[in-house]
């Protein structure tokens, strides 16, 4: 009887945890952030769109086509400066320094970009990005 109570408590609490969505934390977020930036750097916009929240994917791809980014946008460098996980582990803020050129301008631009990621459907997805070459394109 003495073992039965702790065992039942363990089963009940363990079952509750199994139904609570758990993010992968920073270990799961970092590769997503790196791969997203590599894909936009090498103009793999369709591959990069897989890291966006579903409601932003088509808008993002349409904007790339309309702006001829496969031809006119060159992301010359990026550096992830900071990654902060929200206390609940389901949201994250990523700060990146990005450098790019968009023709016809011959000037390289640099911006500190803040991106918001959300853990949804067992994956980290980019929800918002301010500044940078895609400023104003996320709802």
PLM regions: where:
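Short solvent-exposed beta->alpha transition segments
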Residues: 30-31, 45-91, 106
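Bacterial N-terminal signal peptides
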Residues: 5-15
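Short, low-complexity N-terminal intrinsically disordered segments enriched in polar/charged residues
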Residues: 15-42, 50
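Structured segments of extracytoplasmic/periplasmic soluble domains
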Residues: 35-43, 51-55, 101, 120-123
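Exposed beta-sheet edge and beta->alpha loop/turn motif
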Residues: 87-139
């Amino acid at each position: 009887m003495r073992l039965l109570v702790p065992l039942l408590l363990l089963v009940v609490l363990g079952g509750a945890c199994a139904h609570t969505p758990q993010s992968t934390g920073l270990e799961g977020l970092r590769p997503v952030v790196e791969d997203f930036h590599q894909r936009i750097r090498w103009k793999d916009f369709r591959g990069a769109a897989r890291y966006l929240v579903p409601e932003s994917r088509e808008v993002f791809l349409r904007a790339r086509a309309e702006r001829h980014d496969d031809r006119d946008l060159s992301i010359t460098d990026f550096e992830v400066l900071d990654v902060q996980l929200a206390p609940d582990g389901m949201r994250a803020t990523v700060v990146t320094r990005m450098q790019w050129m968009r023709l016809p301008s011959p000037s390289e631009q640099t911006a500190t970009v803040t991106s918001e990621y959300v853990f949804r459907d067992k994956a980290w997805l980019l929800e918002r990005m301010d500044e940078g070459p895609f400023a104003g394109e996320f709802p």
